[in-house]
């Protein structure tokens, strides 16, 4: 059947018709809301490159988590900013570390809210890299770093996290973490693996927020080359074999093709991270009056879900949830 019998504009004529045939629908339950937790008391430091985002002390992080829950958001993702760093990342696996303390406080205030915790060493390392450094060469040592990552995940699980999210991109980290969790009695703690994490320019504002920029070099020796798509399927497959419960593509918008290919190769839940640079671009354009923030954000997140994401990690989560409820 063709025109004039078939007129596709018929189903676009009214808001009700458009809603009736809509193929992709966003919900607050799709979102994970990142929160940056900093040491100290009553701290609320704005992140200049991410309007509306703050470094929060634990009391404010709890309040922000409760606000998200009230908006229908079911999960928060915690990133820790310790008051001290060293070359062994001791703050990452300290039972009294910033993420561990924040996890306990949030779970006490909101037992049903899901807490996801970032498993990486960069925020805790004095040099800012995601693993242990060989001092003479500056190389990030893969296998030595696995032990610290596994200890970090187990420490977070002991604090009550529901999901650990290794973002370091060391080979074999999912298997090491799964083994450590199971050995320590945390077999029900999920692993959301940053399976396809690219060495992206879009992380810049995050590194301001998390104070995690490397002090020398870059992360291209362990994060993925932005030019590669097939490699993402290899990475994802390995993480699944090693025991990942959820696999992630990061960033989201520049890698929708990768997200679609990952979605087509696994029946596991797939997450996508709408990263800080994507957030900052929309915020900057909206503040200058160059686009409609609400429409742009919803369009971007709908595109991420349409490409195959079951879970969207986004700094826009509270705004979108509020728009939906209004």
Predicted features by range, described:
Residues 1-22:
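N-terminal amphipathic/basic leader segments beginning at the initiator methionine
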Residues 2-6, 27-32, 38-326:
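Alpha/beta enzyme core
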């Amino acid at each position: 059947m063709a025109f004039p019998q078939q007129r596709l504009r018929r189903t676009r004529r009214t808001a009700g018709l458009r809603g009736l045939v809509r193929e992709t629908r966003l919900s607050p339950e799709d979102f994970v809301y990142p929160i940056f937790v900093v040491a100290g008391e009553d701290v609320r430091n704005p992140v200049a490159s991410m309007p509306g985002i703050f470094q929060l002390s634990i009391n404010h992080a709890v309040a922000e988590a409760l606000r998200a829950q009230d908006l229908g958001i079911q999960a928060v993702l915690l990133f820790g900013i310790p008051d001290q760093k060293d070359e062994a990342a001791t703050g990452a696996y300290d039972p009294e570390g910033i993420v561990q303390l924040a996890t306990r406080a949030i779970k006490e205030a909101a037992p049903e809210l899901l807490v996801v915790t970032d498993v990486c060493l960069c925020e805790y390392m004095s040099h800012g890299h995601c693993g242990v450094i060989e001092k003479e060469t500056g190389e990030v040592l893969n296998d030595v770093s696995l032990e610290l990552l596994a200890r970090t995940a187990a420490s977070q699980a002991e604090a009550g996290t529901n999901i650990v999210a290794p973002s370091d991109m060391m080979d074999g980290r999912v298997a090491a973490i799964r083994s450590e969790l199971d050995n320590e009695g945390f077999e029900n703690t999920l692993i959301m693996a940053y399976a396809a994490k690219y060495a992206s320019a879009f992380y810049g504002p995050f590194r301001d927020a998390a104070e995690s920029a490397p002090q020398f070099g870059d992360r291209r020796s362990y994060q993925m080359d932005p030019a590669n798509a097939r490699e993402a399927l290899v990475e994802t497959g390995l993480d699944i074999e090693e025991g990942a419960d959820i696999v992630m593509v990061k960033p989201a918008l520049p890698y929708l093709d990768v997200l679609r290919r990952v979605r087509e190769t696994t029946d596991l839940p797939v997450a996508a991270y709408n990263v800080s640079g994507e957030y900052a671009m929309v915020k900057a354009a909206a503040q200058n009056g160059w686009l409609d923030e609400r429409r742009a954000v919803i369009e971007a997140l709908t595109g991420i879900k349409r490409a195959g994401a079951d879970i969207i990690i986004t700094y826009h989560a509270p705004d979108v949830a509020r728009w939906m409820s209004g």
